[in-house]
Amino acid sequence: MGSVCSGGRYESLASDGKHAYPGVGISLGLTRLLAPILSRGELSSSRSVPSAVLVAVNAEEDRATSEAVAVALRSRGIPCEVAPKADKFGKQIKHADRRGIPFVWFPGVKHADHRDADTVKDIRSGDQVEADAASWNPPTEDLHPGVIGTR
């Protein structure tokens, strides 16, 4: 099976050329501990990816807008990803659903005299609201994946 935990003292762990410096270290095999629990179905995650939001791409020429939304969300600690390609919104929603991403962000479309508002959709409930990447937050329980115990 292998080691679960190891560690020790290392006499010459680092050197500046003239002096050798000792160090200590420890390693925990969390994957070795969790693998049997996960394989028995006693633990699972609330979603398979860390992203809470998929930012849709209206058209490839608008990808920069979607990337800018993603940068704004990430700068505020909201894990997100940009759709891999511009496609019908239904396909982008299905992509998010397959990956377990609860929200899809639709950047507003630019018109000659203005830009439509961005909207975000909770694909579980179908609720869709106007949103601003500088202030919108998902519910706390959706921000990061969680561990779910079955016992």
Predicted segments with their positions:
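TRNA-recognition modules of translation machinery and tRNA-sensing kinases, especially anticodon-binding
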Residues: 1-151
